[in-house]
Design a protein with these regions (language model features):
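Surface-exposed loop/turn motifs at beta-strand-loop junctions within extracellular Ig-like
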Residues: 147-149, 438, 495, 537-541, ...
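Acidic, Ser/Thr
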Residues: 491-496, 584-590
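Solvent-exposed loop segments of extracellular immunoglobulin-like
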Residues: 499-503, 592-596
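Short beta-strand segments within Ig-like beta-sandwich modules, predominantly Fibronectin type-III
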Residues: 511-518, 603-611
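Basic/polar, cationic surfaces and motifs that engage anionic cell-wall
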Residues: 2-7, 23-24, 159-220, 224-293, ...
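Solvent-exposed segments in extracellular or luminal domains encompassing
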Residues: 520-528, 613-621
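Long non-globular sequence segments
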Residues: 2-257, 554
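Glycan-recognition surfaces in beta-rich domains, encompassing non-catalytic CBMs
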Residues: 40-131, 135-138, 146-147, 155, ...
């Protein structure tokens, strides 16, 4: 027998992984030597859990039962049980607990009664039970049970509270506090803040068991904590050697059949420190696994994944010592972080018969997700792991995670949807089903049940949501990419990489690169021309899927300036620091022109269809205009042109007729010529490729004839509603520089004969 020890809460603080609440663990009365010895063995030794039992007091009319608020031995998981496994509580079962860390009491927490204790009927000591609930480290409890309305038979006999300390959560006393234990989320029910007097168990004779004595705790204090177990890729030991001298050793098992898909990492029973002395019977084996039933368990989402191994130990202890089963009922347990734990012993790769779905335990395996998923979706990490385990187990027996199968009912019953089952008759089931599909329960909760189609899709394949996310080394234009040759294609998929066997990069429908399923990019070298690029994913099931096609053009030919850059004077305001001009060009590309950049004397970028731009240049200064054309693939071509604007004052012209000189700071050089005499003329001679006549304009300005190289080129009207100075009003350009003459002649317009000229600008 294990020595009895009572733990009174104070002091040492432990750390457990996420963020939030300090949890103070109890101080044991063990000696330093005892503690040191247990700490040395903690990494390899199983953890023995404590179970404490207290009978509920039933009301005279049989319609309610309770357990008064009281101090308890430390526990983290609880449930209510009763004598007849076939009996039901049709009303409600609720408990409230006191936090060992804060001393605060929770609100009333419901305990699920929709389980069937007949799962392993025929065994001695099998009891009816509620679903166990994880409440975290606690040292006080109160329970109330009410029969449902119209319940004629009242409550089941032998109502009893079972509390479980899964061990492994207490830190031995040391010289200083150990560390902080951190809870990931608060409990679902808020603390009430009040703490009425609690009733010690020994002071309430009416609460003592009437149908069976409450056994004296016979477990040692929990072993010291250890880091959360890591999933192992090695097969867990099929079963541990029993620690009791009367138990027969489990024979060495041959491996189960290979699966069509990889085995996911699984934390073995040894790693979660299962107390194998609880489960001394040999496991029962099935002929195979035809279907998987998904469950939820522990009735809370407010747990830290660092506590998951302790929760599994608590479930194991509860199923054996409270339900009276031979072992943990589920074949696999998954926490919200996606860690998979080995459940019932016998070998994870063997078809071990569990105790999870009454009437359909044969030919099936049970996977339970720790949490409550009635209204809350299970985490993606959890559903991913459920899908991986289901695919692996079904793959051992050529099952289809997306398919259906006939299962023979092992007992009369019904499911949540109202379908009835008759023992010995076969019924169709999805090969991944929820507990509610085989039994009248909400399990695995409406939200998790609604996630089963997505779980089937993950497990069965193919890879979904496959798209090309990027083409590095190429430039996109619309839906087409352009590259010189080398690219790296990146992709993404909604299916997690753990289900992907591999990816292939296809060019023109042929693979050019093959990578593993956790790789999301691959390089390729393309020949010149247009190519269709895709990614093909192979699911672990062997099913394939293709991404949409991406068009990639490989192009090594540079763009061409079909029209070289050229400069021409334009109309506008002229000053001694800026002469208006136009820069013209035309660039083309065999594939796709991206842009043309002006790099000097200023930086500008123009679109592929732009062929001219307005600029200014400083007079009397040679300026180089440099341009580079870029295509979509990154090929380039450069071209340039140089020009010098020159201002010829009116005094540089050959005069004809009558002209007067006008002075003003508004004129180029401070002076201009004006004439109202018909036929008066000015002639400039220059060598250049563009010319612009500069004038002053006003409402009274008249007209002039313009002659170029002796030929009349235009009649120009200088009239303007607003007075303007230094206006280039007329321009003329040639393809190359040459000697030219420009002559202006006063028309003598009626009513406004005068005109004022401010010189000529030419470009050389």
């Amino acid at each position: 027998m294990r020595a009895q020890r009572r733990v009174w809460a104070t002091a040492a603080v432990t750390t457990a992984a996420v963020a939030g609440v300090l949890v103070f663990q109890g101080v044991t009365g063990a000696s330093d030597a005892d503690r040191d010895g247990r700490a040395a063995d903690a990494k390899s030794a199983p953890v023995e859990a404590d179970v404490h039992k207290a009978a509920l007091k039933t009301s005279p009319d049989g319609g309610s039962a309770s357990l008064a608020r009281r101090d308890t031995e430390p526990f983290s998981l609880l449930g209510v049980t009763w004598t007849d496994p076939a009996a039901k509580v049709t009303g409600s079962v609720e408990a409230r607990t006191r936090s060992a860390a804060t001393g605060a009491w929770t609100g009333w927490l419901p305990l699920d009664t929709e389980i069937d204790g007949r799962t392993e009927t025929g065994r001695s000591g099998v009891r009816g039970t509620t679903e166990p609930r994880w409440v975290g480290p606690s040292n006080g409890v109160e329970v109330r049970v009410r029969a449902g309305d119209g319940a004629r038979s009242g409550l089941p006999a032998g109502l009893r509270l079972d509390t479980v300390d899964p061990g492994g959560t207490s830190t031995p006393l040391a010289a200083e506090p150990a560390a902080f234990a951190v809870e990931e989320t608060p409990t679902e029910e808020p603390a009430t803040g009040d703490e009425p007097p609690v009733t010690p168990p020994t002071e309430d004779p009416a609460e003592e068991p009437t149908d069976e004595p409450a056994p004296t705790p016979t477990t040692e204090s929990p072993a010291p904590p250890s880091p959360p177990p890591s999933p192992s890729t090695e097969p867990p030991t099929p079963s541990a050697t029993p620690t009791t001298p009367t138990a027969a050793p489990t024979p060495t098992l041959t491996p189960g059949p290979p699966s069509t898909v990889p085995r996911p990492p699984i934390v073995s029973r040894a790693d979660w420190k299962a107390d194998e002395s609880l489960s001394t019977e040999a496991p029962d084996y099935l002929d195979g696994v035809k279907a998987v039933f998904v469950h939820h368990t522990a009735q809370t989402n407010a747990y830290s994944c660092a506590d998951s191994a302790a929760i599994v130990r608590g479930l194991h202890t509860y199923h054996v010592k409270s339900n009276g089963w031979k072992d943990l009922g589920y074949n696999f347990i998954v926490d919200k972080c996606g860690t998979v734990f080995e459940g019932r012993k016998g070998g994870v790769d063997r078809p071990v018969m569990g105790a999870h779905t009454y009437g359909f335990n044969r030919d099936t395996t049970g996977i339970a997700v720790i949490g409550m998923y009635t209204d809350t979706k299970a985490a993606t990490a959890a559903t991913t792991s459920v899908a991986r385990v289901a695919a692996w187990k079904l793959g051992q027996y050529q099952g289809d995670p997306a398919g259906s199968v006939q299962l023979t009912a092992g007992a009369n019953g019904g499911n949540f949807a109202g379908q009835s089952f008759v023992a010995g008759k076969a019924y169709p089931f999805r090969q991944i089903s929820g507990h509610r599909d085989g039994f009248n329960t909400q399990c695995p909760g409406g939200s998790l049940h609604a996630q089963l189609p997505a779980i089937r899709s993950l497990a069965a394949g193919p890879v979904t949501g496959l798209t090309i996310a990027s083409v590095t080394g190429a430039n996109a234009s619309g839906s087409t990419y352009y590259t010189r040759s080398k690219i790296t294609v990146g992709w993404k998929a909604t299916t997690p990489s753990s289900f992907v066997k591999g990816y292939e990069l296809l060019v023109g429908g042929k693979p050019v690169a093959t990578v593993k399923g956790n790789v999301t990019s691959a390089p390729a070298t393309l020949a010149a021309g247009k190519h269709s690029v895709q990614v093909r994913a192979t699911h672990q099931s062997g099913k394939t899927s293709l991404s949409p096609v991406a068009t990639v053009v490989a192009d090594t030919a540079p763009p061409v300036f079909s029209t070289k850059p050229a400069l021409a004077l334009r109309t506008g305001t002229v000053s001694t620091s800026a002469v208006p001009l136009t820069l013209r060009w035309k660039a083309t590309d065999a594939a796709s022109l991206k842009e043309v950049r002006l790099t000097a004397p200023v930086a500008k970028t123009y679109g592929p269809t732009t062929s001219s731009a307005s600029h200014t240049a400083k007079p009397a200064k040679a300026t180089a205009w440099k341009m580079t054309a870029y295509d979509r693939a990154g090929n380039t071509a450069a071209a340039s042109v140089s020009g010098t604007p020159v201002i010829l004052q009116e005094s540089a012209a050959k005069k004809g007729g009558k002209w007067t000189t006008k002075s003003s700071g508004s004129y180029l050089g401070g002076k201009s010529y004006s004439s109202s005499t018909k036929g008066s003329s000015l002639t400039w001679t220059f060598t250049g490729r563009s010319a612009a006549w500069v004038v002053s304009r006003a409402a009274t300005s008249g007209q002039a004839y313009v002659y170029v190289d002796g030929k009349k080129a235009a009649t120009v009207d200088l009239k303007s509603s607003a007075t303007k100075y230094r206006q280039a009003i007329w321009t003329k350009s040639w393809s190359a520089g040459a000697k030219h003459t420009v002559k202006i002649v006063v028309v003598g317009t009626k009513g406004r004969p005068a005109l004022t000229t401010d010189g000529l600008v030419y470009l050389k």
